């Protein structure tokens, strides 16, 4: 059984509240879970201590026993110092697309040609 530490949504319409739960990876988001491990209230201020509440001892126990936290939960655990989150590095994502690179090269070529023509005209 693959276990995930993930968020289960609660609260009412446009007033989200999430429980940090341990659940089988195949169960629905708000479905059956094995243990409630904390909560997250995104409506509270970011510096409020009640915004994210975690049971660090139980979370460590379940991670040692093979449970995988989701990306969002891993961010909370990293902030709390419970688990380490590796920073994602994708330098290719920052590059413009192929056609944009071609257009930039054409524009640079036009600028270079114009500068050369201006230099010839000045002589």
Curated annotation (Swiss-Prot):
SUPFAM superfamilies: Ribosomal protein S16 (SSF54565). Coiled coil: none annotated. Residues 111-123 have a biased composition (Low complexity). It comes from the Bacteria. Keywords: Ribonucleoprotein, Ribosomal protein. Pfam families: Ribosomal_S16. NCBIfam families: S16 (TIGR00002). HAMAP family: Ribosomal_bS16. This is Small ribosomal subunit protein bS16. It comes from Rhizobium leguminosarum bv. trifolii (strain WSM2304). The gene is rpsP.
